[in-house]
Design a protein with these regions (language model features):
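Toprim catalytic domain recognition across nucleic-acid enzymes
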Residues: 1-337
Length: 337
């Protein structure tokens, strides 16, 4: 209807806030919009500016300032280099809100009918969202796949061998010219090896018989193969990986993680915590390398910094990854946290 053009109305009880902002805006030469540096922040800033006269003749006095951290340097730089409201970001946020409603208004009544209109624990109204509805579908498909799975059983033969005062683990991989079956050889549909002619399946009697035969045998290392490998560090935190790590290490929910991150951001300890980016500024990289050299020594510094420049499709490119704010990379102890 009407080309999906949304109609925005003032939240009940907030008229006085808008009236106050309008009154104050008339007393200044410039209005600086410093809402959060993401799509939602851009849209909020745009709607505030609209209410204050952004699209009238004096719209040029409305300037957008963006910063990813509450530090003196970041805020000062943003104030010295104001920009314009990014209408592409505003349109992107608006499209997402419209899609939320197109999906939610259609699916939520079905959710209420089939499950419940409210959460049985919190008693909050339930709704079906654009993202979580698809996620639930993926979970259902995965559960159906799990239920179709047919388990199988097999035995491994493991040993601890010793040589020159040292020990190392060993595993039986071949028997009578055939490869000993492992989990990767089984079909999830049958619970049996996919190619029973190519592998030998150890059952318990066979495995125990082999143990009895080999217990007193001597073994010879026929060859040694050495391989180099590199273990790359994980990329810097973005919102999703921060939530995952906080859950794995601290057992925090996504909501609790974001609540703590919001407080750290507002206190000037970390950069903005809602980001898809793994990019770090040159200032941050220099600060991190300086701290490593100071604390651990130059031998622990890589010859050149590792850059994570590629972004996921649709990522909010202007953002940095989540990192300690400022250019000193102080520890929690140094900050008194």
């Amino acid at each position: 209807e009407n080309g999906f053009e949304p109609e925005y109305v003032t939240v009940r009880g907030k008229g006085a806030v808008i009236a106050s902002l309008k009154k104050q805006a008339k007393t200044v030469d410039d209005v600086l919009i410093a809402t959060d540096p993401d799509r939602e922040g851009e849209a909020i800033g745009f709607h505030i500016a609209q209410k204050l006269g952004y699209q009238t003749d004096d719209g040029e006095r409305f300037r957008r300032v963006r910063f990813n951290e509450f530090t003196r340097d970041a805020v000062t730089k943003a104030l010295e280099n104001p920009g314009e409201i990014d209408m592409l970001q505003v349109d992107a946020q608006q499209a997402r809100r419209i899609l939320d409603r197109l999906v939610g208004y259609g699916l939520s009544p079905l959710l209420w009918k089939k499950i419940s209109p409210v959460d049985p624990v919190s008693r909050r109204p339930l709704s079906a969202g654009r993202v979580q509805s698809v996620a639930v579908r993926l979970l259902v498909e995965r559960e159906r796949e799990r239920r179709r799975f047919r388990s199988g059983s097999w035995w491994d033969l493991l040993a601890t061998l010793g040589a020159d005062g040292g020990e190392f683990p060993a595993r039986l991989v071949k028997l009578a010219g055939k490869t000993v079956a492992t989990g990767r050889d089984f079909s999830p549909d049958t619970g049996k090896p996919s190619d029973e002619q190519e592998v030998v399946l150890l059952d318990e009697p066979t495995a125990r018989e082999l143990v009895a035969r080999l217990e007193d045998e001597s073994f010879v290392v026929s060859s040694i193969t050495s391989k180099d490998f590199k273990q790359k560090p994980y990329p810097p935190f973005r919102t999703s990986t921060l939530q995952q790590e906080a859950n794995n290490k601290l057992n925090l929910s996504a909501r609790d993680t974001m609540r703590v991150a919001q407080r750290l951001y507002e206190a000037g300890h970390i950069t903005y915590m809602r980001t898809d980016s793994v990019r770090l500024s040159s200032q941050a990289i220099g600060a991190a390398r300086g701290r490593i050299e100071e604390k651990y020594g130059p031998e622990f510094l890589s010859p050149s910094p590792r850059n994570y420049g590629k972004q996921a499709k649709g990522a909010q490119e202007a953002h940095e990854a989540i990192r300690p704010a400022g250019n000193q990379m102080r520890t929690a102890e140094e900050l008194g946290l």
